[in-house]
Design a protein with these regions (language model features):
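Bacterial N-terminal signal peptides
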Residues: 7-15
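Mid-chain, well-packed structural core segment of small domains
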Residues: 91-108, 112
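A short, N-terminal "cap"/entry segment at the start of jelly-roll beta-barrel domains
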Residues: 18-59, 146-153
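Positively charged n-region of N-terminal signal peptides that target proteins for export
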Residues: 1-4
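Double-stranded beta-helix
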Residues: 24-27, 101, 121-153
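Conserved metal-binding segment of the jelly-roll/cupin
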Residues: 105-127
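Conserved short histidine dyad/triad with adjacent acidic residue
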Residues: 51, 61-78, 106, 115-117
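Glycine- and acidic-residue-biased ligand/ion/polar-headgroup-sensing regions
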Residues: 68-71, 77-98
Length: 153
């Protein structure tokens, strides 16, 4: 009986510690997403940071990127690996240093991973598209062709 009482007491203590660990859940609804322009991206693209601080090393970052219709994102690389998911619309993506609209437009729910330093580009069809990107900061973008970098214009 003492063993049962001790086991039950320990379970309650451990359970209470896990349940009250100070963490909470942040829920972000679509209407709460705050879109902004980013000088590192071409005009027409909007970005929303949902989780994390892209300037901090080691921080998990989740961002959404909204692309206008009939748009091509120039070839670029990042200093991180990225996990990308199509949230809405249709978008094509490919690897390489020259943008060619070859391949299918991917539908919502499609996802892919680009490794750190991997040159890639994207394009949209007739409609707007939204991607969700997850990476470990710090963020950054380097254009394959420096003339494509809007920060230098």
């Amino acid at each position: 009986m003492k063993a049962l009482l001790l086991s039950t007491s320990l379970a309650l203590l451990v359970g209470g510690a896990v349940a009250d660990d100070g963490r909470h859940t942040n829920v972000i609804t679509p209407d709460a997403v705050k879109w902004t322009e980013n000088p590192a991206f071409p005009k027409g693209i909007q970005i929303a940071t949902l989780v994390g601080d892209p300037t901090k090393a080691g921080e998990t970052v989740v961002q959404r990127i909204k692309f206008p219709p009939n748009f091509t994102m120039p070839p670029h690389t990042h200093p991180f690996s990225e996990v990308v998911t199509v949230i809405s619309g249709n978008i094509g993506t490919n690897s390489g240093e020259k943008p060619e609209r070859k391949g299918d437009l991917l539908k919502p729910g499609s996802m892919w991973v680009y490794p750190k330093g991997h040159a890639h580009y994207a394009w949209t069809g007739d409609g707007e598209a939204v991607l969700q990107v997850q990476y470990t900061g710090p963020g950054g973008i380097q254009y394959v062709n420096p003339a494509d970098d809007p920060r230098k214009k």
